[in-house]
Amino acid sequence: MAALEERGLSQDQTEKLLQFQDLTGIESIDQCRQTLQQHNWNIETAVQDRLNEQEGVPRVFNTTPNRPLQVNTADHRVYSYVVSRPQPRGLLGWGYYLIMLPFRITYYTVLDIFRFALRFIRPDPRSRVTDPVGDVVSFIHLFEEKYGSTHPVFYQGTYSQALNDAKQELRFLLVYLHGEDHQDSDDFCRNTLCTSEVTHFINSRMLFWACSSNKPEGFRVSQALHESTYPFLAMIMLKDRRMTVVGRLEGLIQPQDLINQLTFIIEANQTYLVSERLEREERNQTQVLRQQQDEAYLVSLRADQEKERKKKEKQDQKRREEEEAQRKQMLEERKKRNLEEEKERKSECLPAEPVPDHPDNVKIIFKMPNGTRVERRFLFTQSLSVIHDFLFSLKETPEKFQIVTSFPRQVLPCLPSEEIPVPPTLQEAGLSQSQLLFVQDLTDD
């Protein structure tokens, strides 16, 4: 299995490759792989196509012809049971036999020559399989019309499907090839195959597939199993990991004799199925154990991944918080620096403080938000914006503030607004020569 996986095959393709090899008996792994690849790894069509490899039959893919792919029929341990036709009895019987013998020889010789010559003129239509399931279903309908509904349960599918199901279910598969032109076929179907005891025995012990050798699907199976006479039965099972013919029953066999022969074949080969069933259970248990280990590993892996994810998420969150704090700090520092530069610029732009004896002097005492007092002289003719710029230039002054008179209490319009585009002068604002003003902090607002 490891060697196959090294060839670049998936587990599903490896299983199909081994199953195809079991069904067809091909020894070459490379040949099996090539055939499956030609059929896009469809094992059913691959088996059907390989069974089509008979002389004069076109294949789906035009590849180099190889030996026909068949179920293993060369096992030297295969059990074979042939029922010969009864010998003539008495003088009358022998006389009739000797009289008819030349006619039989002549008839079958001419028939064989005719069929042989016909092959050169027109290929055997049975060699072209176009609807294998239809061939099987058609035979079942004709069988029931002629022999009734009491019969073993027919497998309604192709031969390769029956092989595959028998392998998967570890069951025996009994294959019946019906020779419509054979003199014993009608007797076998009526008096052996359709009896209640044979029907019950087959239904309870095995799968049953049947088709007429005159149908393309039946003819193809006939070419694979190489029957010598009719009625023909073949018992197939999974043996040594290959679908193998373990029993062949040919001739007009009686009901009880058929049951006895099938029982003998089953008992002689049951150990192979038991062994395969134990091996399969062991493989299933190993697979279940491996699956449980894989699931446990996946659970552990997911837990580790979740742990790693949370750890990374926490690290990312911490990094984002640090970056955000650093960004805010930089913004705060830049804002502080810009504020200091603005204060310095306002301070440089302030008009000089008037002398104490100037007639338009206004002495203003500012009470700061921190409780300290600041005193400065201004002129009545100066704008209230000069007062605002002076206070703004002071280090202890907050970034945002307003100037309020004590009585009557009012906010001085020191900055331009929609209502007052140009701030008034100190005189227009009604300030006296000595004035107390309050500076209110608006930073939090």
Swiss-Prot record:
UBA domain segment(s): 12-48
Protein name listed in UniProt: FAS-associated factor 2-B
One Gene Ontology term of the molecular function aspect: ubiquitin binding
Source organism, top-level taxon: Eukaryota
Positions of region (Disordered): 302-355
Function: Plays an important role in endoplasmic reticulum-associated degradation (ERAD) that mediates ubiquitin-dependent degradation of misfolded endoplasmic reticulum proteins. Involved in inhibition of lipid droplet degradation. Involved in stress granule disassembly.
Record field: compositional bias (Basic and acidic residues): 303-348
InterPro entries registered for this protein in UniProt: FAF1_2-like_UAS, Thioredoxin-like_sf, UAS, UBA-like_sf, UBA_8, Ubiquitin-like_domsf, UBX_dom, UBX_domain-protein
Source species: Xenopus laevis
